[in-house]
Amino acid sequence: MKNIQKILPLYFVAGTQDCRHLGENLSENLLFVLKQALEGGITCFQFRDKGKFSLEHTPSAQKALAINCRDLCREYGVPFIVDDNVDLALEIEADGIHVGQSDMPVQEIRAKTDKPLIIGWSVNRLDEAKIGENLAEIDYFGIGPIFPTQSKENPKPTLGMAFIQTLRNAGITKPLVAIGGVKLAHVKTLREFGADGVAVITAITHADNVQAATKALREASDEYAK
C-alpha cells in the first residue's frame, strides 16, 4: 500500500512558465531549480507545464523535459507527478497524475494502467471533498487555492487556511495537501489544521536561494508532522 502521507510534506509544483525570470533557456531553468529543490528536501514534484509561457505548444520538447525531470527525481528517490496530461504520465511512466474536477475521471485513469499510479484530485469545495472521499481511486486531495495566487490562470475562489480544518471536522480522512499562495509563515498553521503537507510554486521558484528556502519549508512542515 502506498504511504501517501510520506510524500506530501513538501510538494513542489512547477513548469517552465514558473522559471522564465531566470533566463531564456526554459528547460535548463526548470532543471536547475528542481535540482536545488531536491537538494533542499522536497518530498514530491509535480510537473505542471502549461500556459503561454510554457512548452505546451512544443510537445516533443515538453516530453523531453518531463523525462529529464522524472530522471532527476528518481536520482533522489522523490515521486514524479504529472499534472493533467494522463497520456504523458503513462507514456513516460510517471509515478502519478494530478487532475482537476473537469479533467479525465479518476476511474478512467485507474483503468488505463495496472501499475500503482498515484492519483491526486483538486478540491475547492466541501461537497467535492465528500464525493472524492468515497472514490477509492483517489490517493490524496490538493486543496486550494488557500490564498490568492498568480501561478494559475483563472483561479477558483480562495479558501483560507481554516478550510483545511473544516474538511477534517466534516470527516474527510484522505490525505490533504494545501496549495495556492502558501508561504513559509503559513506552514505551521496548515499542518496544525490537518494538512498532511503544503504544495508550493513561487515560494521555491522565486527564492533568492532555492535550496535554503526549500530546506526551511521542509523543516517547518516536518516539525508539525503527525
UniProtKB/Swiss-Prot annotation:
Binds 1 Mg(2+) ion per subunit. 4-amino-2-methyl-5-(diphosphooxymethyl)pyrimidine binds at residues 46-50, 83, 122, 152. GO terms for molecular function: magnesium ion binding; thiamine-phosphate diphosphorylase activity. Belongs to the thiamine-phosphate synthase family. Condenses 4-methyl-5-(beta-hydroxyethyl)thiazole monophosphate (THZ-P) and 2-methyl-4-amino-5-hydroxymethyl pyrimidine pyrophosphate (HMP-PP) to form thiamine monophosphate (TMP). PANTHER family: THIAMINE-PHOSPHATE PYROPHOSPHORYLASE, THIAMINE-PHOSPHATE SYNTHASE. This is Thiamine-phosphate synthase. The lineage of its organism: Bacteria, Pseudomonadati, Pseudomonadota, Gammaproteobacteria, Pasteurellales.
